[in-house]
Every structure is written in structure tokens, then in C-alpha cells.
Regions:
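Helix C-cap/helix->beta junction micro-motif
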Residues: 56, 86, 141, 206, ...
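Active-site-adjacent pocket scaffolds in enzyme catalytic domains
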Residues: 5, 114-208
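Generic enzyme active-site microenvironment
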Residues: 7, 91, 244
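Well-ordered, non-membrane alpha-helical segments in soluble/globular domains
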Residues: 42-49, 74-77, 105-106, 190-200, ...
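Histidine/acidic-residue-rich catalytic or RNA/ligand-binding cores of hydrolases
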Residues: 101-106, 133-137, 158-161, 224-231, ...
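C-terminal domain-boundary segment and adjacent tail
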Residues: 197-255
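Metal-dependent polysaccharide deacetylase catalytic core of the NodB/CE4 family, i.e.
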Residues: 47-50, 54-136, 149, 173-181, ...
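Active-site beta->alpha N-cap acidic-glycine motif
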Residues: 1-82
């Protein structure tokens, strides 16, 4: 079985980035969508992700930051509650400045748990700012898994899939991420599904029981490239030996 650990990093405040930021990236959007969508809604896609995943009968993990530039985590409270009620998972998207300080990570975890009212067991550091001392800190704080590790920005091979246990924490390398596909690997929209097919084949050749970790950022769904998400789900759910899971369900199988 090829297990897909499907997740979304919520990088921007609930109100979206500053208008200047959006205008500078106008060409990332179809002109009609850009013209007919309020700037603050161009990056807002959590409800649409939920709708799509519900349609395909799957669930994923949403990693929320606790430090948003000119915004607050509490602005996402309604989204977080909706996700939890629908059996999606909430994980911590740790601030890069916190990774060397266990107390800062603890404070972030507790801040997120004050909204979820349930323990947070999954972590991913913003910008994948991983270091070798991180797992032991996460273990002490009650995390079960981390998904911050990536060896290369421009290639996908066996090193970028599977899982390992480091200092008592399950580590999932990042296999496929929208930003790396488009920016570092130069994959265009037409090449996205073929790249997923190729990655699944690498996984099948690597191991009969394997994990492929996918990040599709919450803000890209209306963008060129990012809008292929529905087609990605269509392809993945058509494969008999592929199962899509949030991190919390995946670790139960791997334990």
C-alpha cells in the first residue's frame, strides 16, 4: 500500500497577505478569478479544501502557525472548529525562531491546543527549518510525529519518502510540495499529474508499504498550478493501492 500523508500548511493570516503582496503576484491567477475575487479571499481556501476532500471521501492535516504577521491565530478559530468537527486533523506549524527553544515550542503547542481543546500530536516547522535536535524536544512535549524533513528541493527519490523514528518521534520526509514542484523543479501545470504518477511508481518500487508525504498549501488553490488539486485527488483515489490519510491516522497504522 502507498499511503499518502496529505497536508496543508496555513502560512498566511485569516485576512490574507497585504494587498501589495497579492498585486505583485497577480499573474499567478487566472484573470477572471483575480477580477471577481476580493483580494482577502484569493488566498482563503479552507472551506473549498473541505468540500473537495469530502467529495472524494478523504481527510487531511492542516498545520496552523501561532505567529501570523499582522494577524492572530484566533481569527482561525471557526475554521479550526469546523475542521475538527469534520474529522480533519490540526497540527502545529512551528515558527522557525522557536526550534532551538523547547519552551517556545511548548508555548506554541499550548496556544494552538487552547483552540482545539485536544492534544496536538503532529508538527511541521515553517520553511521546513528542521535540525537534528528538534525530535527530542518534540518527544518531551508529547508530539508523536514531525513532517519537517526534506533532503533536496529539486528532486524526488526514495530518500524523500517512507518514514523513520528519530528520538522516539516518527519522521515523515516531505515528498511532494507545490512550491518545490513549481519553483525548484520547474514543473508546469500539465506536468503535475505525470509527476505524481512518477512519484507513486518510485514508491511502489521502493516498498510495498510506503509513505508519500504531500503538502498543498492552503493559499494556492485558486492559483495556476495549485488549482490542479482536484485532479490530483481524482488521480490518487483512482489507484487501488493508494490510501490517503491525515497524520493522526497514519501513525496508528505505523505503530
Amino acid at each position: 500500500m502507498q499511503y499518502i500523508f496529505l497536508s496543508h500548511d496555513v502560512d498566511w493570516r485569516r485576512q490574507g497577505p497585504p494587498v501589495e503582496h497579492v498585486l505583485e503576484r497577480k499573474d499567478r491567477f487566472d484573470s477572471e478569478i483575480f477580477a471577481n475575487t476580493k483580494p482577502e479571499n484569493l488566498y482563503r481556501n479552507i472551506p473549498k479544501y473541505m468540500e473537495l476532500e469530502e467529495r472524494f471521501g478523504i481527510r487531511s492535516t492542516f498545520f496552523f502557525r501561532t505567529v501570523y504577521e499582522n494577524g492572530n491565530l484566533s481569527d482561525y478559530e471557526d475554521d479550526i472548529q469546523s475542521l475538527l468537527k469534520g474529522n480533519w486533523e490540526i497540527g502545529l506549524h512551528t515558527d522557525p525562531q522557536s526550534v532551538n527553544d523547547i519552551e517556545k515550542i511548548r508555548q506554541e503547542k499550548e496556544k494552538l491546543e487552547s483552540l482545539t481543546k485536544t492534544p496536538i500530536i503532529g508538527n511541521r516547522v515553517h520553511f521546513l527549518n528542521y535540525n537534528s535536535e528538534l525530535p527530542i524536544k518534540l518527544k518531551k512535549l508529547g508530539f508523536v510525529y514531525d513532517a519537517s524533513l526534506r533532503y533536496s528541493k529539486n528532486k524526488i527519490d526514495e530518500k524523500e519518502m517512507g518514514h523513520s523514528k528519530i528520538d522516539g518521534v516518527i519522521e515523515f520526509p516531505v515528498t511532494l510540495m507545490d512550491a518545490y514542484l513549481f519553483t525548484h523543479m520547474g514543473i508546469n501545470e500539465e506536468g503535475i499529474i505525470p509527476e505524481f504518477k512518477k512519484t507513486i511508481e518510485i514508491g511502489r518500487n521502493f516498498s510495498d508499504v510506503n509513505v508519500i508525504s504531500v503538502i498543498w498549501h492552503d493559499n494556492v488553490l485558486k492559483m495556476k498550478g495549485g488549482r490542479m488539486y482536484e485532479k490530483i485527488l481524482e488521480f490518487l483515489t483512482s489507484q487501488d493501492d493508494v490510501k490517503i490519510l491525515p497524520g493522526k491516522d497514519l501513525v496508528k497504522i505505523l505503530k
